Curated annotation (Swiss-Prot):
InterPro entries: NADH_UbQ_OxRdtase-like_20kDa, NADH_UQ_OxRdtase_20Kd_su. Keywords: 4Fe-4S, Cell inner membrane, Cell membrane, Iron, Iron-sulfur, Membrane, Metal-binding, NAD, Quinone, Translocase, Transport, Ubiquinone. NDH-1 is composed of 13 different subunits. Subunits NuoB, CD, E, F, and G constitute the peripheral sector of the complex. HAMAP family: NDH1_NuoB. The gene is nuoB. Its cofactor is [4Fe-4S] cluster. GO terms for biological process: aerobic respiration; electron transport coupled proton transport. [4Fe-4S] cluster binds at C68, C69, C134, C163. It catalyses: a quinone + NADH + 5 H(+)(in) = a quinol + NAD(+) + 4 H(+)(out). Disulfide bonds: none annotated. This is NADH-quinone oxidoreductase subunit B. Belongs to the complex I 20 kDa subunit family. NCBIfam families: nuoB_fam (TIGR01957), PRK06411.1 (NF005012). Its EC number is 7.1.1.-. It comes from Yersinia pestis.
Length: 225
C-alpha cells in the first residue's frame, strides 16, 4: 500500500497550505521498526492502532456550512439516519474543539480566506471532507467568483459527489474517513519516532466498484431503482 508522507517542520516559513512538502512512499512505514526490533515494532504498532481507534470513533465535526449541501449534512443528525452510531454527532461551535471540517456548498472567493483561517485554527490532527459538486470542483458555477474546488487551498481527505449528496453519502464518507484514520501513522511524541504523518492513499470508489458494475448483466428497471 502506498502512503503519502508529510514532513513536520514546526520552524517552517510557510504559514499557508501546503504547510509542508509531501511525497509518496511505498510500504508500511512501520516495517523499518519491525526489522530493527520485533518487540518494539509490535509495541509501536499496537500503540498506533489504539490511538487511531480512539480518533476515528470520536470524530467531532465543526458546525459550518456554505450552501444547500449543509442541509443534507445536518439531516444525517436526525433520528432517521442517526449519525451518532459513528461517534460524529457532537457538533462543535469552535474550530479549536473540532476534529474535522465539512465544506458543504459553494465556496466563493470572498469566503475562501475565512474557511482557510478556520481550518488553521483547528488543532491537529484534523481532516477535511468536501461535500457536493460545488465544493469538489465549483459545480455548475464556472465563474470568476467561485473557487473551482476547495482543494485549491485546503488538503481534502474525502470527496462526496452529488448535487446535493444524500445524507447516506455523507455517512459513507465518514466511514471512509474512519478507515483512512485507522491506517494513519502519526508521531506518538515530538521526541519518539519519525516526525512525519503517513496517510494511506485511498482508492476511489469508482475504481473499487468498477469490476462489480461491469459484471452486472441484468439491469434493473427504472421502477426498481
Amino acid at each position: 500500500m502506498d502512503y503519502t508522507l508529510t514532513r513536520i517542520d514546526p520552524n517552517g516559513e510557510n504559514d499557508r497550505y501546503p504547510l509542508q512538502t509531501q511525497e509518496t512512499v511505498s510500504g508500511d512505514p512501520l516495517e523499518q521498526h519491525v526489522h530493527r526490533s520485533v518487540y518494539m515494532g509490535k509495541l509501536e504498532n499496537a500503540m498506533h492502532d489504539m490511538v487511531n481507534w480512539g480518533r476515528k470513533n470520536s470524530l467531532w465535526p465543526y458546525n459550518f456550512g456554505l450552501s444547500c449541501c449543509y442541509v443534507e449534512m445536518v439531516t444525517s443528525f436526525t433520528a432517521v439516519h442517526d449519525v451518532a452510531r459513528f461517534g460524529a454527532e457532537v457538533l462543535r461551535a469552535s474550530p479549536r474543539q473540532a476534529d474535522f471540517m465539512v465544506v458543504a456548498g459553494t465556496c466563493f472567493t470572498k469566503m475562501a480566506p475565512v474557511i482557510q483561517r478556520l481550518y488553521e485554527q483547528m488543532l491537529e490532527p484534523k481532516w477535511v471532507i468536501s461535500m457536493g459538486a460545488c465544493a469538489n470542483s465549483g459545480g455548475m458555477y464556472d465563474i470568476y467568483s467561485v473557487v473551482q474546488g476547495v482543494d485549491k487551498f485546503l488538503p481534502v481527505d474525502v470527496y462526496i459527489p452529488g448535487c446535493p449528496p444524500r445524507p447516506e453519502a455523507y455517512m459513507q464518507a465518514l466511514l471512509l474517513l474512519q478507515e483512512s484514520i485507522g491506517k494513519e501513522r502519526r508521531p506518538l511524541s515530538w521526541v519518539v519516532g519519525d516526525q512525519g504523518v503517513y496517510r494511506a492513499n485511498m482508492q476511489p470508489e469508482r475504481e473499487r466498484k468498477h469490476a462489480e458494475r461491469i459484471a452486472v448483466t441484468n439491469l434493473r428497471t427504472p421502477d426498481e431503482i
